[in-house]
């Protein structure tokens, strides 16, 4: 092969690599644009439903306050993040926001039970046991909201979680058929928040799709009326 042909072949290879690189960059930018567009839409859609505590207590006919689970320590102690969610939800209950509390979290094994830890904490704070319902299969934000509507029959709810997570939670509930509002737990700076913010940015797009196609959650079950006693949910349903 002549030197001229070799240089031409090498030049063609370099151009091909460059074109592939530019194509991948263009795809990445389009994906980023799509994710950002969904993020902005969801934030704008839900923003009027994010309330201060005093505004939430002024709502009428709220079926329940939904407190979303988070990690527990040593099997029986709420993590700081979960404790702050519980404190806000309990404050709303005591202020008359709703007659019942629905605690939704992960009870995926006999060795890990977020919701029982949550209920025990609330009882120690003076909330009657019969006013606390447990959703043992709230394995994700989407599943918690799906089950709140499908299993517990909730129609109008106030959701409590941290501010960074609240938009997605309310969006899920709203698009699964509930009149949903949200109140953020106390704005504490927890370690690793930057990573959580990035995950939430991606999770908003995931749940945007989930609420469009509406797949059933991992676990369903028989209906449970919020008009009865929450003690019927003390065991896994």
Residue ranges of model-derived segments:
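A structural signal for short, hydrophobic/glycine-enriched beta-strand patches
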Residues: 37-198
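A general structural signal for short secondary-structure boundary/capping elements
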Residues: 108-114, 181-184, 203-210, 226-232
């Amino acid at each position: 092969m002549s030197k001229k042909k070799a240089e031409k072949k090498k030049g063609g290879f370099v151009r091909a690599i460059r074109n592939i690189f530019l194509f991948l960059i263009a795809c990445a930018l389009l994906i980023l644009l799509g994710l950002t567009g969904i993020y902005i839409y969801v934030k704008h859609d839900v923003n009027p439903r994010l309330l201060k505590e005093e505004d939430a207590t002024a709502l009428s006919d709220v079926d329940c306050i939904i407190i979303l689970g988070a990690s527990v320590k040593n099997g029986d102690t709420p993590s700081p993040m979960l404790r702050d969610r519980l404190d806000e939800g309990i404050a709303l209950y005591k202020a008359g926001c709703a007659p019942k509390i629905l605690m939704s979290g992960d009870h995926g094994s006999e060795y890990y039970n977020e919701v029982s830890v949550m209920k025990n904490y609330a009882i120690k704070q003076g909330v009657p046991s019969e006013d606390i319902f447990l959703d043992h299969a709230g394995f994700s934000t989407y599943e918690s909201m799906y089950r709140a509507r499908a299993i517990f029959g909730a129609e109008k709810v106030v959701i409590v979680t941290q501010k960074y997570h609240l938009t997605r939670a309310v969006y899920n509930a709203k698009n699964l058929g509930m009149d949903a509002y949200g109140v953020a737990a106390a704005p504490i700076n927890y370690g690793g928040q930057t990573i959580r913010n990035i995950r939430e940015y991606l999770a908003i797009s995931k749940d945007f799709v989930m609420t469009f196609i509406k797949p059933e959650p991992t676990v369903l079950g028989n209906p449970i009326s919020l008009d009865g006693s929450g003690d019927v949910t003390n065991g896994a349903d």
